[in-house]
Amino acid sequence: AGFAEYAVLPKEALVKIDSHIPFEHAALFGCGVVTGVGAVINTAKATEEDSVAIVGLGGVGLSALLASIAIGSKKTIAIDLSDEKLALAKELGANHTLNPKDENFLETFLDITSGGANIAVETAGSGHALKTAYDITRRGGTTVAAGMPGPKVEITLSHLSIAAEERVIKGSYMGSCIAQRDIPKYLDMFQTGKLPVDRLLSRKIKFEDLNEAMDRLDDAKTVREVLIP
């Protein structure tokens, strides 16, 4: 995120990629894709037997959505306040899309999942989003916090429900990924069509478009934009 044409890095921080992969697609894997995909595959260890809910549909959340679909989760449910993002999630293959602002949101969610999601992944970096993820997780299920909030954001959870319902709450930093191990794996999934992250690329921009791009990102009007010097 330094917006530099070149960077000096130790070799341990580099991952060799197939020369056939366009740079504008490879660039997506440096943060958002590994965080979202890793949260589902590494942190939550989701399987085809799980129902997976993604709360927050930015670049990280939509990457998590693609991961859930790629592993064949029983159900993939997308949750966001933006109807445009929900429409994109549906296009990408989500089984259900829900807006928390809708009337009877929780009741509807619990109905379509028969009591809650096995796994709920929060990717918005919002205390409200994490609370929503916890509330829609079923008894014995796992809630993953993958979003990065401000240092003073706090939430209140029921101690009783954590204990009595045998809940699991896990943090996920960069998708619990080891770059040299996981990025080649995810790139292979991309090349074989299992992880179509290129569909998350909203536009390619030049340096002179940078401020407008940052505004779009701040207003949640874009998913991923790649700077081409």
Question: Which residues does each PLM region occupy?
Answer:
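Adenosine-nucleotide cofactor-binding segment
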Residues: 54-57, 69-132
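N-terminal Rossmann-fold NAD(P) dinucleotide-binding loop
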Residues: 61-62
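C-terminal hydrophobic helical "lid"/dimerization subdomain
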Residues: 131-135, 180-229
